[in-house]
């Protein structure tokens, strides 16, 4: 196999920005009461005015609702300011000591200072606020949150790589808060322990490569028995580089892949006799994947999520189910175990092919079919042409499933075409879920039976959720 880039490009030299000036505490900083958290886990408050009218909105990082803090503004606009906390004058009972040594500088996590149960409650509030404000909806039932291990859960990550001689040499990890620098992190509490322990050895290994200062990132994917690292090699690697990778792989029990170009250029390098996969034991499913395929970052939560989604969808043995944005078959294959027929539709040809292969591997090819289609442009006629499906499962990216929701609304208005009686919608962006839910309820005639959060990314502001819609 070729390990050279299909075309040469000029090496990218990474420049480091000047450090932001540190705030000098004077004791005269303004003080504010924190009311809530926004979508980025920043505290939200308003300045106090003499006549009691609402003042300017202030977004303060590192604070919690109920706290009274002094702050320093680093960006001011006519209607709001962005600020950093100087001192917490009154602490929230929800405040906890961050486990990670690097929490104050690393941008990988934003909520370690908030108790994990309170994190889930905050995310549930974000979900409900989006549904109410954007779609004028309240779920009939608030589902019990899905949560699990909050440390060592991150089985996928993109680790930035930079050579910074003025900052001490090689760095590998996440970016600093509000900076393009990479945090000087020697361990990471949200990565699996064996990966966290590799961060420093990885620095030394990359420094030995000929492309050490022209390598932008390492892509991490952890499977059930294999840990893969994708080297983004914008230039060909040398024979000496290859030996460095082999030696590291043997010592640390990892598999290296190379990516000289776009995602389609990713190929395994060494060793070649192992395979990435994850399992769904409840359904007897083994799911092989490539390290650049989309899979959920949190394997434990994904297993619970699949189980919850299938229980809510409750397919009968006679049901035909449509799985939209099916990926490599994360929901499709378990559904095939308990329903008559499942059709998976995915926008990526690569993922569609992987789903088809996984169906064959798991013995459910006779109950599944797959199609590659752009679901961001799907129409009512497209859905009609697919025929009748009793139930839908929708698991879109952050952009949501607007075209699907519009198509269902058009079918409902026209009365021409079948509609599923039940829809389970798995979302990774509450704003687009709310938008699509508004169409499904107000225009397509569905009820929002329930919704709840899925804490897929503990200690971050990311809100994943699941919702159930039914049509009488």
UniProtKB/Swiss-Prot annotation:
Renumbered residue ranges of the record's region Disordered: 1-23
Binding site residues for [4Fe-4S] cluster: 100, 106, 109, 188
EC number annotated for this UniProt entry: 2.1.1.190
All residue ranges annotated as the TRAM domain in the record: 23-87
Catalysis performed (reactions): uridine(1939) in 23S rRNA + S-adenosyl-L-methionine = 5-methyluridine(1939) in 23S rRNA + S-adenosyl-L-homocysteine + H(+)
Active site: residue positions: 428 (nucleophile)
EC class (word): transferase
PROSITE patterns the record matches: SAM_MT_RNA_M5U, TRAM, TRMA_2
Chain sites annotated for binding S-adenosyl-L-methionine: 296, 325, 330, 346, 374, 395
InterPro entries recorded: 23S_rRNA_MeTrfase_RlmD (IPR001566), MeTrfase_TrmA_CS (IPR030391), NA-bd_OB-fold (IPR012340), SAM-dependent_MTases_sf (IPR029063), TRAM_dom (IPR002792), U5_MeTrfase_fam (IPR010280)
Keywords attached to this entry: 4Fe-4S, Iron, Iron-sulfur, Metal-binding, Methyltransferase, rRNA processing, S-adenosyl-L-methionine, Transferase
Protein name, UniProt field: 23S rRNA (uracil(1939)-C(5))-methyltransferase RlmD
Originating species: Paraburkholderia xenovorans (strain LB400)
Originating gene: rlmD
